[in-house]
Design a protein with these regions (language model features):
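Extended, subdomain-level signal for the structured scaffold at the beginning of enzyme domains
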Residues: 1-97, 101, 110-121, 129-173
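Catalytic nucleophile serine of serine hydrolases
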Residues: 105
Length: 173
């Protein structure tokens, strides 16, 4: 169990990408991590494909200094989550502490609003390529990769690669 003792937030809101959320949560738990689902309220939140998830806490309830990482799954949820300053502040605070930030698919929208993509390489859903580039990122069309504390994943079929990179980064941090 590579992540025993690690505390990791996974963001959730209505419209989350079911597999990007649930596979990542299960993979982190499988490695022994304490996973805290954070959303704008308790939920239940409904995924794009109708799976449900509940939040354990809101962003205001979580101390970035106690976290080893944060994950931003895709779907439509990132467009909602980026509107909550407490969410973008939490993402920025985790990044400022050089802790792992995992971003897949449309999760880059939250990273943009958190101000953490300028000058970095990034990937995600092709639908947000222009957003990432306009925010100062360099687009990289790869399934998943790591750059410093940022772990990027493209889309649903790339979840295995994303989770592999994410677990590796979290186990080193």
């Amino acid at each position: 169990m590579k992540l025993r003792g690690k505390k990791i937030v996974v963001l959730v809101a209505d419209g989350f990408e079911d597999l990007e959320y649930w596979v990542t949560v299960m993979r982190l738990r499988e490695e022994g991590a304490e996973v805290i689902s954070v959303g704008p309220g308790e939920g239940p939140f409904h995924g794009k494909n109708y799976l449900e998830a509940r939040a354990d806490a809101t962003a205001n309830d979580v101390d970035a200094g106690e976290l080893d990482g944060i994950v931003i799954p895709g779907g439509w949820a990132p467009d909602k989550l980026r509107r909550y300053e407490e969410v973008t502040d939490l993402v920025a605070a985790v990044h400022e502490r050089d802790k792992t930030v995992g971003i897949i698919c449309h999760g880059g929208l939250v990273a943009i609003s958190a101000g953490i993509v300028n000058g970095v390489s990034a990937t995600g859903s092709l639908g947000i390529k222009d957003d990432l580039v306009n925010a100062g990122a360099t687009w990289v069309d790869k399934p998943a990769f790591r750059e410093n504390d940022l772990v990027w994943g493209r889309v649903v079929p790339d979840i295995p690669d994303f989770c592999r990179e994410l677990v590796a980064a979290l186990s080193e941090g």
